[in-house]
Amino acid sequence: MMGRLRVRDVLNEIKWSGKYRASDVEVYFVSRGYRNDVEKVLFTDILELRRGSIIIRRNHEEKYIPHHRILRIAKISGETIWSK
């Protein structure tokens, strides 16, 4: 799935296609203050896919992540599905 696909398209494919198990997919994004300023969440922690962002659940709170901050989407095994 690598290439010039938009992150939104990749997120929707993971959610709807059945090609991937959401519990086996991690999303890496820029998050100031985290180690190397990168945080990751399981795809199952995504509460909502929006046009230009995702909403995640983190420590019992919702967090807004714009698409431009997403750096990489990968399987837990390390295989990259999409990267910036």
List the predicted regions and their residue ranges.
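Short, compact, well-ordered microdomains
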Residues: 52-84
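N-terminal recruitment modules of adaptor/scaffold proteins
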Residues: 2-61
